[in-house]
Amino acid sequence: MRFTVAIDGPAAAGKGTISRAVATHFRFAHLDTGLLYRAVGAKVTEGADPVAAAEGLDLADLARDDLRSAEAGQAASRVAALPEVRAALVAFQRSFARREGGAVLDGRDIGTVICPEAEVKLFVTASDEERARRRWLELAAKGGTQSEAEILADLRERDRRDREREAAPLRPAPDALLLDTTELTIDAAVNKAIEAIELRQAQGRE
């Protein structure tokens, strides 16, 4: 059985949390595609060529402890704007998406570029201020020293870069379900996603 769930959205909107919960609920495989770009970005900050880093990426690179840092996020956004880097990572993502048993992929262009044929497409968003608060709490728990205002500025700059890039700009797929998590608890947001997937599965059985 092949069933693909594409979950897109800006940073700290909740798509990663929702994706992991959905994958666990349905026993689907999960891929955080942002980690691919963060891993490439981290290699580039160490002096690697972006395209070579993308072509040589392996699963071990996705386990680095520094991939959730603000620096890795900014580097990811920069390398993601390079068409050659995106092309090098597309095949990996598409192969993962059509694996047997179902798959959940979260990122910024899954429903629009990587898997436009996905059975379910969600676009998860939240207000800038709420996303900054969430990311600040996440980083502070790990000993981060960035202020909430600095994180807000970083998020807005990354959003601008992601929306304006020529290669796969950040935007909802025309048939994506919009899920605004600003006022939702994690459980409520996850339940909405599960309901959308179950509805699509039921339609497929009709």
Curated annotation (Swiss-Prot):
It catalyses: CMP + ATP = CDP + ADP; dCMP + ATP = dCDP + ADP. GO terms for biological process: pyrimidine nucleotide metabolic process. Keywords: ATP-binding, Cytoplasm, Kinase, Nucleotide-binding, Transferase. It comes from the Bacteria. ATP binds at G9, P10, A11, A12, A13, G14, K15, G16, T17. GO terms for cellular component: cytoplasm. It is an enzyme of class 2 (transferase). The keyword Nucleotide-binding applies. Its main location: cytoplasm. It is found in: Cytoplasm. CDD domains: CMPK. One of its GO terms (molecular function) is CMP kinase activity. The keyword Zinc does not apply. Its EC number is 2.7.4.25. Residues 155-168 have a biased composition (Basic and acidic residues). Residues 155-174 are annotated as: Disordered. Belongs to the cytidylate kinase family. Type 1 subfamily. This is Cytidylate kinase.
